[in-house]
């Protein structure tokens, strides 16, 4: 992440130097560059979740999935490059959250019940609640398919301002990991987990989540009038939401969300 920030800083300095040379030569390229943008505001809703790519064998069924208030508000700037091609940069404020209830078998867990931490393989049901607030900067190449339709694709970087990953394991049993045994060994002490508070095992992995995320964002804008339009997109995280050393959940969990919304041209 430091290399990316440093690269962006060097690019900005180089662009500023280029603009300064042109101004000194009597041109106004920098002013033309700044005023050659069109600005857009948009509001939308994310539909998706945080999940591994490919369902692991230890997750047997999905009991329920609940939508959350995953709103996104942002401002984008578009700059024409050549012909139908252009560049889009933006600043987005996002919520990415989900709540799932899944049936698992032989699923590695670390939980707390009655103040005691337990680790082992669990068979039963697991509720997972994920909630992330993010500030996202997308950088996209745009192509105007027609005067009313614009396609966009490119990378994004997000800073996670608040994050939660918590839940509980219930209605099942945990084979407790014995000292010196592999964490997947299903022969340890059997600990029964019930349905209600005090009977189930809780977990909270919020402190193990990353502060920065990177991914790919693709989408399309369709303008119904000169200023108003509809938008749709897909953001796919390329970095997992947890730090690389976190191994309680063995599958890498990626934020994968589709977006629908409306867009308004400000200028």
What are these regions (language model features)?
Residues 222-223, 254-267:
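Outer-membrane beta-barrel "beta-signal"
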Residues 49-68, 96-133, 160-213, 240-257:
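Extracellular/periplasm-exposed beta-strand and loop segments of Gram-negative cell-envelope proteins
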Residues 34, 80-82, 146, 225-227, ...:
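Outer-membrane beta-barrel channels and translocator barrels
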Residues 1-34, 267:
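Cleavable N-terminal export/targeting peptides
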Residues 84-87, 148-151, 226-232:
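Repeated loop/turn-to-beta-strand initiation elements of outer-membrane beta-barrel proteins
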Residues 77-79, 95, 143, 159, ...:
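Residue-level signature of outer-membrane beta-barrel architecture
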Residues 37-39, 69-75, 135-139, 214-218, ...:
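Hydrophobic, lipid-facing positions within transmembrane beta-strands of outer-membrane proteins
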Residues 39-43, 89-91, 139, 153, ...:
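Membrane-embedded beta-strand positions of outer-membrane beta-barrel proteins
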